[in-house]
Curated annotation (Swiss-Prot):
Signal peptide: none annotated. Mn(2+) binds at residues 152, 154, 223. Its cofactor is Mg(2+); Mn(2+). InterPro entries: DXP_reductoisomerase, DXP_reductoisomerase_C, DXP_reductoisomerase_N, DXPR_C, DXPR_C_sf, NAD(P)-bd_dom_sf. Catalyzes the NADPH-dependent rearrangement and reduction of 1-deoxy-D-xylulose-5-phosphate (DXP) to 2-C-methyl-D-erythritol 4-phosphate (MEP). It comes from the Bacteria. It catalyses: 2-C-methyl-D-erythritol 4-phosphate + NADP(+) = 1-deoxy-D-xylulose 5-phosphate + NADPH + H(+). Keywords: Isoprene biosynthesis, Manganese, Metal-binding, NADP, Oxidoreductase. It comes from Ruegeria sp. (strain TM1040). This is 1-deoxy-D-xylulose 5-phosphate reductoisomerase. Pfam families: DXP_redisom_C (PF08436), DXP_reductoisom (PF02670), DXPR_C (PF13288). The gene is dxr. It is an enzyme of class 1 (oxidoreductase).
């Protein structure tokens, strides 16, 4: 338009919290973007509305059973409708400059890999991809001249703090955690924490699963592993600090003693906008911090008794191989059981640990080569292992 090239983009996970925040930014500059594909889950009505408004080429629902509903909602719009995992991978192969990967869970891995194989810039909000197959993703990006930009607020903060720096000069990386909904609860009370209580976050507006993962610190455990995979630092160089205000997102310590921090309001549009506009910084509709009004920033060390997920993350990083895929699969399934009311809040950690141990006891499984097929297999086996433990406990 008038000599300005529109940026071709796709958003996978468009109906979730990250996807909707991305669309909010796109909506503010519609002439700058040509939307190729949008994908979503059960919220077919929202997916169709957004696809029509943004004039996407194709809209994909993850669920085959919802395809006819999506087709009906898109009738006469000119937007193609599709469903299922294969359609997602096909959409990822379509020419694009930038793809947002915000699908929750291991389902985001295959389309993410396909996008990187096309040389597309991948804005990665799907932390499970890096946890399950970080080496595979990073190698695929390198092989095809593609770039991965982090969208987690913590990893975006680290990425920004490292601009102009050399990773070998980094002494430590500190990612912060709000502490979640139960940060000030007595430990004993956590045994009876309800689904509704775990689904409420004090600072961030997020989806239910990630909010529960925040309360249990499984979200932070994934982010610790993600930090290792993305930035290539040793496990012992990664620290977590509980920071209740969620204003300092990460800090990078260098060998000269300097500590670089990134501050911003708890609004995911910061990290999304940075990835969308990188290497430029465009204006964003987010709150500006008034440090004088804030007055003080609070930090404290995490209690590993309260947050056993952080201990498990260190064990997974030391173990290496496909243990990240096993950890994530077991964690996801344990979360399913908590949401379904079959187990208590604290049972998620012990279940995940048991599922992980079951797979690690199988000779050669965790040390198998890192391929998409092996990652998918280990993820499936971890989920089944957790199901078996739940059946034994409740049966």
């Amino acid at each position: 338009m008038h000599g300005v090239t529109m940026k071709k983009i796709s958003i996978f996970g468009a109906t979730g919290s990250i996807g909707q925040s991305t669309i909010d930014l796109i909506r503010r500059a519609p002439d700058a973007y040509d939307v190729v594909a949008l994908s979503g889950g059960h919220n077919v009505a929202q997916l169709a509305r957004d696809a029509i408004e943004l004039q996407a080429d194709i809209a994909i629902t993850a669920h085959d059973a919802r395809l006819e509903e999506l087709r009906s909602a898109l009738a006469g719009s000119g937007v193609e409708a599709a469903s299922g995992a294969a359609a997602l991978v096909e959409a990822a192969s379509r020419p694009a400059d930038w793809i947002m990967s915000a699908i929750v869970g291991a389902a985001g891995l295959a389309p993410g890999l396909k996008a990187l194989e096309q040389g597309t810039t991948l804005a990665l909000a799907n932390k499970e991809s890096l946890v399950c197959a970080g080496a595979l993703l990073m190698q695929t990006a390198a092989d095809h001249g593609a770039r991965i930009l982090p969208v987690d607020s913590e990893h975006s903060a680290v990425f920004q703090a490292l601009v102009g720096e050399r990773i070998e000069e980094v002494e430590r990386i500190i990612i912060t955690a709000s502490g979640g909904a139960f940060r000030d609860w007595p430990l004993e009370r956590l045994k009876t924490a309800s689904l509704a209580e775990a689904s409420s976050h004090p600072n961030w507006d997020m989806g239910q699963r990630i909010t529960i993962d925040s309360a249990s610190m499984f979200n932070k455990a994934l982010e610790v592993i993600e930090t290792r995979e993305f930035f290539g630092v040793a496990p012992e160089q990664i620290e977590v600090l509980v920071h209740p205000q969620s204003l300092v997102h990460a800090l990078v310590g260098f060998r000269d003693g300097a500590l670089m921090s990134h501050l911003g309001a708890p609004d995911m549009r910061h990290a999304i906008g940075y990835a969308l506009h990188w290497p430029d910084r465009n204006a964003l509709p987010v709150a500006r911090l008034d440090l004088a009004a804030i007055g003080q920033l609070e930090f404290r060390a995490p209690d590993l008794q309260r947050y056993p997920a952080l201990r498990l993350a260190q064990e997974v990083m030391r173990r290496g191989g496909l243990s990240g895929a096993a950890f994530n699969g077991a964690k996801e399934r344990a979360l399913d059981h908590f949401i379904a009311g079959r187990i208590g809040f604290l049972d998620m950690a012990s279940l995940t640990e048991e599922g992980l141990a079951t797979l690690e006891a199988q000779p050669g499984l965790i040390d198998a080569s890192m391929t998409l097929e092996n990652v998918t297999r280990v993820d499936d086996l971890a989920r089944r292992a957790v199901d078996q433990v739940v059946t034994q406990r409740t049966g």
